[in-house]
Amino acid sequence: MDQYHNPANPAAHEASTGPELWAQTAGRITHFVAGVGTGGTITGIGRYLHEQNAAVVVVGADPAGSVFSGGSAQPYLTEGVGEDFWPATYDTDVCDTIVRVSDRDAFLTARQATAAEGILMGESCGTALWAALQVARTTDDPAALFVVLLPDSGRNYVGKLYSDAWLRSAGLLATDEQVADYDWRATQLGPVVQRDRTA
């Protein structure tokens, strides 16, 4: 199958997921946010959305240490998103903005969202959600409609993401800190790579 090189990967999302999001939002979507891994999902959906409305902002959420948000690959803890190479299935022209997300922000956002919404999500979901929250902070349009793709379950991360002891051992949670103490608004927006589509 080779999802990193198979053109059917983005094509499937351009043919199905993109049209579904457009229909479900009645064409009112203004921002689409997703993690970048193979790049197939964000490429396919982003292409479709830009074909419908070039003003839709496609935001790629990328772990700090991955190559998509710039720089060379470095180790990071977030699983299921980011890469240390450029997949053939990722169209670098699709994302209008790429937000770099730290492991701490990804993990703790996922934990807090799970507690608040009852959705057992993995850390790649936390990556996308944190990026969406940060971009939403900079948007003054009251009619803005964000769609955030949350692709993984936290079921496989119970001993890691959902373990305070593990988070502390990884340096993501201070000794005397609780997950509930984390405030995503207190974190400054990480490096953002923006594309000027007016040129």
Task: Walk through the language-model features, giving the residues of each.
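Active-site/ligand-binding loops adjacent to catalytic centers
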Residues: H50-E123, L161-A199
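Phosphate-handling active-site elements
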Residues: E51-G60, V135-L145
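A short, acidic, amphipathic alpha-helical segment used as a generic capping/interface helix at domain edges
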Residues: A106, A113, L129-T138
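ATP/nucleoside-binding phosphotransfer catalytic cores, i.e., glycine-rich phosphate-binding loops
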Residues: A115, A143-Y162
